[in-house]
Design a protein with these regions (language model features):
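PLP-dependent amino-acid enzyme catalytic core
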Residues: 1-464
Length: 464
């Protein structure tokens, strides 16, 4: 199993090198050279497996034999032992043919834990085997940062620096990043929005001198292992609803396109998914793109679902690569247009192919609040704002097959928005009860590449 860049000008890498690299040196994103395939009989044989066993079955083909089976099994079991639900990602019925896939039972109450707990252990294992250290830099619109810090805190082979938009994350999200006492954790509040943070991250990866000097690695969903780990819960939920003999559809709250691309990967691997529905908030670039065929950025609008307040969806590049029949030159042309003018037009055949796999819709803040209220009244189920956006869109896209809405965060991560909508104040689980009283530790920096690189260089052990 080898991994190739979406831009076609970086060397193909094995699994271990691909996850340590994060972003390819040509600015592209790594994808498998070919998709593993499971037959219907293979998928039937997965029925009844516990979540860790299912993860081992689904993910092993991606390793290319680079991690010994007993080691990988141990890392997977350790990762999912951190979750506080026996099913890891349980499925809850909220309507006649509607289900919420609860992805928020991990240490930081967000779906990012599902991938991050495994990624941290995989990276730690590879670095230890090689006797190396790495500097992790990540950008977050809220949940990625807390999940990454929890997963990497105290690990001897990595220092982690998380960039988040100053004043644009929820209080719970901020404290999950700023209250760690681990010496290898650095929270950086950037004066700007998430796209500024993500732009700094990409610029650091594209500064090859800096990248090599600090042994830079990334844990954003540009890292293939993040996408890979998320494929598993598409299999687990579909199996619960009768796959492979019964198709299912999924609606996914979408910002950076990583979570829904994992669903696309599951479909490429043989899972019978009828529709993949993209749900956006007021920052609706993906819904507009599917409607018009033109990807055009606008300003970012702050909403009650901040993890979706994004205009540059990094993982959309992976879909462009697939839709163009893996024509890296086409992807490079699109990305050049995005950099030069903030826009590009997708070829007619390619957008038609995308529309055959995906639907897209949006929910504004009033619709999100109304959906939180109605779901509580009708189903006695409390949604966070991101899941509510998906639930609103899912209602418009309902069909004959079961619709699984991805529940991406616990409502207590967004108490102000949830209480304003429903009148109910969601409480943090007891085991996180002290979070809001812990002392914070973070540094405010301008959106300036040199200042951020200097800060990282002075503190990264790999640079010494």
């Amino acid at each position: 199993m080898h991994y190739v860049s979406t831009r076609g000008e970086a060397p193909a890498l094995g699994f271990s090198d691909a996850i340590l690299a994060g972003l390819a040196r040509d600015g592209g994103l790594y994808v498998p050279r070919e998709w593993p395939r499971f037959s219907a009989a293979d998928i039937r044989a997965m029925r009844g497996l516990a979540y860790p066993d299912l993860a081992i079955r689904v993910l092993t083909p991606f390793l290319g034999g680079e991690i010994a089976a007993p080691v990988f099994e141990r890392l997977v079991r350790e990762a999912y032992a951190t979750f506080r639900h026996e099913a890891v990602c349980p499925l809850v019925q909220t309507g006649a043919n509607t289900f919420v896939l609860e992805l928020f039972h991990g240490p930081t109450l967000a779906f990012k834990d599902v991938a991050m707990q495994l990624l941290a252990r995989l990276m730690d294992h590879v670095l230890a085997e090689r006797g190396q250290h790495a500097t992790i830099v990540g950008a977050t619109s809220g949940d990625t940062g807390g999940a990454a810090i929890d997963a990497f805190a105290g690990r001897s082979r990595t220092d982690i620096f998380i960039l988040f938009p100053h004043g644009r994350v929820s209080p719970v999200q901020q404290r999950q990043m700023t209250t760690s006492t681990a010496e290898n954790v650095h929270a950086l509040a950037i004066e700007g929005n998430f796209d500024d943070c993500q732009g700094l991250l990409k610029d650091m990866f594209n500064d090859h001198g800096f990248r090599d000097r600090v042994s830079l690695s990334g844990v954003n969903s540009i890292n293939w292992a993040r996408i890979m780990a998320q494929i598993v819960y598409y299999f687990s939920s579909a199996l619960s609803l009768g796959a492979p003999d019964r198709p299912v559809s999924f609606t996914v709250p979408t910002g950076n396109f990583g979570d829904i691309f994992a669903g696309y990967a599951a479909k490429k691997m043989g899972l019978p998914i009828e529709r993949l529905v993209i749900a956006t908030n007021d920052n609706d670039i993906l819904a507009r793109t599917f409607a018009t065929g033109e990807y055009r950025t606008k300003g970012v609008f702050a909403t009650t679902s901040p993890s979706m307040d994004i205009q540059v969806s990094s993982n959309f590049e992976r879909l462009l690569f697939e839709a163009s029949n893996r024509d890296a030159a086409t992807v490079r042309r699109y990305m050049a247009g995005l950099k030069q003018s903030g826009a590009f037009t997708i070829e007619a055949a390619e957008i038609a192919g995308m529309r055959s796999e995906f639907d897209a819709g949006r929910a504004d803040m009033d619709e999100v609040a109304a959906t939180i209220r109605s779901t509580l009244a009708n189903s006695n189920y409390l949604l966070d704002p991101h899941t509510a956006a998906a639930m609103h869109v899912a209602a418009d896209k309902a069909g004959a097959v079961p619709m699984v809405v991805l529940g991406t965060a616990h409502p207590a991560k967004f108490p102000a928005a949830v209480e304003a909508a429903s009148g109910v104040s969601p409480a943090l689980p007891a085991w996180l009860g002290g979070l809001m009283t812990f002392e914070e530790k973070y540094t405010v920096l301008p959106s300036d590449l040199k200042m951020v690189e200097d800060y990282v260089s002075r503190r990264a052990r790999a640079a010494r």
